[in-house]
């Protein structure tokens, strides 16, 4: 068996994407577990968009709770500003040496053949050298009667 180990000294760096979604705590828990398993650095990124200014109070409170939860789980909290969320995530990942991104996805909607790409599709194309882990929100899918990403 002649297997080569590619860059065995490369340190893993996990990035979790923060949001006001109720399922974001599950995403944060998954990313924190990955960081522990890989003995990796752990960061949490919130991308503040112009629309963030109009977020409802309930969503703002949930976002703050998710930020505090990520911090409690050991993440370094980072905020980026911009209107292109996938670009901001990919750019932060590139500049910070992120090796894995953990992001949530509520439900899979029907995308038309020529429709706009989803946030995760854009992120995959903008960060081709980063492992991207998409965590579906099964509860939201069941509540809405839609299929999850992996069904």
Language-model regions: role of each:
Residues 1-5, 73-101, 141, 148:
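Structural beta-alpha unit
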